[in-house]
Design a protein with these regions (language model features):
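Conserved N-terminal structural module of periplasmic/extracytoplasmic solute-binding proteins
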Residues: 2-126, 138-145, 192, 309, ...
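Extracytoplasmic/periplasmic substrate-recognition and gating elements
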Residues: 51, 69, 74, 78, ...
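Short helix-initiation/N-cap motifs at beta->coil->alpha
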Residues: 84-97, 197-203, 275-287
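Paired acidic/hydrophobic, glycine-rich loop segments that form the ligand-binding mouth/hinge
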Residues: 109-112, 292-297
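Hinge/lid segment of periplasmic solute-binding proteins
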Residues: 116-175, 316
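Short, solvent-exposed loop/beta-turn-alpha elements that line the ligand-binding surface or hinge
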Residues: 131-148, 195, 217-220, 240-259, ...
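Glycine-centered hinge/linker elements that transmit conformational signals in sensory
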Residues: 205-210, 246-276
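Long, aromatic- and glycine/proline-rich binding clefts that accommodate carbohydrate-like moieties
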Residues: 365-416, 423
């Protein structure tokens, strides 16, 4: 489906001007900091101005910029935000946009970067470690980490702490769950799905939703399927994985992965889902009752064309159906310190603000399309009451989630995973041949130096 998929795909429109904050368009040079190499030795002052890239949409800008204004009032540090939205609206294109700005010497202190790009930017040598800053505020960082899912934090530290250094502190996350139209389910006498439901349960629900109507049961990603949104949920819930545990080698051609690809291809041939390729607005179709289910994290909440009250009344959220085990990918995002920043102490103050209770309780969902990573916030009734039933599943799923991080030549790897999966869904390649092609191509790409 054509979606505004939050941490995986953004709207093409950028930030709108809002009172109290200066926001530049995506093609305008950001202003407010020097591109010279700063040592980070000077203390932050009220005269500091940070230039930071934010992946937020126009409808989210008012709340987000209000919290930036709160940061400025507390610290005296101003933030000039610019949009990292691009025409193609993928993380790959966002990383390219940021890289181009940095290579061109444009002033930029930081930008919100998803897990997939962390290794990429570290390997390019454009980041400063956070270690000395963390050491100075160890108690505050420890308090924050004590409020993060232990499983997710352990996986993050294992895979994203690079060469013994910390370059990111995660502030938000997303997993993959099923959003379902409760009104459609109820009208057909279908029970609400519950955690632990199976692939068979899912397929049977799709069949009933489509029977004798023009409705579709489920939406697959268009114009191309995404690895995080369309591939990983199916292979992980069958005990498979595109990469091995430490994500150093491709395992795409495993029997579990081929079985998962076969299952999704059967959904296509049975006409239970939209046809691959082209365009399909799953959020709009589901809102209108023309679609029973679609996959996502928390980000669809701001993309569904209904009021929040209508979203809460219409939809429910449940973990992904499983074949052999529960499973979901998880990705996080955070702010690094670019070497070119002349305002590093001030930027560290901003990073600390993003892990604070105040920030986590407010704009994280809107700001990056992510769940707040503090579990005291994400599991609180004051937070959950604002969203559809089942939102608590996002926190529950962290216990068995698989962290998806960047790999060598990551942009090309993600493109190949999408391409091979699409060929399977369209019937251009059999599931076994398609997954073998993915295996061969991804293995080759991961061995290339870029």
């Amino acid at each position: 489906m054509t979606t505004e998929i939050g941490r995986r795909r953004f709207l093409s429109t950028g930030l709108k001007a809002a009172a109290g904050a200066a926001v530049a368009g995506p093609l305008l040079a950001a202003c407010g900091s020097s591109a010279s190499s700063g040592s980070g030795s000077k203390a932050s002052t009220a005269d500091d101005v940070l230039t930071i890239g934010l992946p937020i949409t126009p409808q989210d800008s008012k709340q987000t910029l209000a919290y930036i204004d709160s940061f400025t009032k507390q610290t005296g540090i101003k933030v000039n935000a610019f949009t990292t939205n691009t025409a193609t609206n993928t993380w790959v294109s966002v990383f390219q946009e940021i890289s181009t700005r940095l290579a061109g010497g444009e002033p930029m202190d930081s930008a919100y970067i998803a897990t997939e790009g962390m290794l990429l930017f570290e390997q390019r040598g454009v980041l400063d470690p956070l270690d000395p800053y963390i050491a100075k505020d160890q108690s505050a960082v420890n308090e924050f980490y004590s409020d993060v899912s232990p499983n997710m934090l352990a996986n993050f530290r294992k895979l994203d702490d690079i060469n013994g250094h910390t370059y990111f502190i995660p502030i938000g996350y997303n997993v993959m769950s099923i959003w379902y139209n409760r009104k459609v389910f109820s009208s057909l006498g279908l029970p609400d799905p519950t955690p632990g439901w199976t692939w068979d349960d899912f397929q049977n629900a799709c069949a009933k939703i489509t029977s004798g109507s023009s409705r579709l049961g489920f939406a697959i990603g268009t114009p191309v399927p995404g690895p995080f949104t369309d591939v990983y949920p199916w292979v992980l819930t069958n005990g498979g994985g595109i990469l091995n545990a430490d994500q150093t080698a491709c395992t795409a051609n495993s029997p579990q992965n081929i079985e998962a690809a076969t299952f999704v291809r059967n959904l296509v041939t049975s006409k239970l889902v939209n046809q691959p390729g082209g365009s399909y607005n799953g959020f709009a179709a589901a809102a209108a009752g023309h679609l029973g289910m679609f996959g996502g994290g928390i980000w669809p909440n701001s993309g569904i064309p209904l009021t929040q009250a209508e979203v809460n009344q219409t939809f429910g959220i449940v973990p992904w159906p499983q074949k052999t085990q529960p499973g979901t990918p998880v990705g996080v995002g955070g702010f690094p310190i670019f070497k070119s920043s002349a305002n590093k102490p001030a930027l560290w103050e901003f990073i600390k603000f993003t892990i604070s209770q105040e920030f986590q309780a407010g704009p994280v969902v809107n700001f990056g399309g992510d769940m707040p990573i503090r579990q005291s916030v994400a599991q609180s009734q004051s937070f959950l009451k604002n969203f559809p039933p089942g939102t608590e599943s996002f926190s529950d799923e962290l216990a068995y989630s698989t962290m998806i991080v960047g790999v060598p030549n990551g942009s090309a790897v993600e493109t190949e995973i999408s391409t091979a999966w699409e060929q399977i869904l369209t019937g251009a390649a059999s599931p076994s041949a398609g997954m073998q092609s993915m295996q061969d191509q991804v293995t080759q790409l991961m061995q290339q130096t870029v």
